[in-house]
Amino acid sequence: TKPYFEGPRQYVKQPPAEDCPVFNRHNHCPALVNCPNGDLLAIWYTCRTEPGRELGIVASRLPYGEDQWQVASDFWDAPDRNDHASALWVDEKGTLYHFNGLSAAATWGSLATIMRTSKDNGTTWSQARLIMSEHGLHHMPIESVLRTREGAILVPCDAVPGSAGGSVVLVSRDNGQTWTDPAEGQPIPDFSAGSTGASIAGIHAGFVQLADGRLMAFGRGNNIDGRMPMSVSDNLGETWTYSGSPFPPIGGNQRL
């Protein structure tokens, strides 16, 4: 085999206004999934201003075997609500999951989280439902959903609307039927080396399950000793222990 180099390929392609009225000037916060049929599906929010009620979600697809992304189209847009922000995940049986924040009105401070599923590579979707009944903090999904070896689905969400204050994990142990938030009602931790708390250090967290079963997460903000913060949990996100990572911190316009 030979090395293959290509790109970058633009996936944000502006559609005609009559085909996609929600499309606007500011496009941000993508989620990406490899569909069972080999297609790549990307979604992101589009808006005039990030706090605006006009903010909605659009999608583009790179069909398997093709080298160009399709023009953007409507994906999710609750009328007169700020839809901030999105995550995609595919399970072991090929079912796609879409998680999204749903504001009570404008801004991303007070959100509920919706979930819907697709069994045909994202062509059609189930009716959306709230996975937890109340609006509030801890409901802006981050694009690093995973299923643990124990079978739990974990959806990370920003814990705060600001640039520092951590991330939390919504947990389902029954394949998405019911959900809990281990950090609900808990104070924002002291994100210093050696401390523990109910949240991940840093917003927009990315995380994995290690070979020994622990969860390891990195975040943006809440830097520790001048480094990107690292959080480790040995109880599926119930509590986290903090330390500085080997990596330099990241800031605005950067994500894990």
Q: What label would you give each PLM region?
A:
Residues 1-256:
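Asp-box/BNR beta-propeller blade signature and adjacent active/binding-site loops
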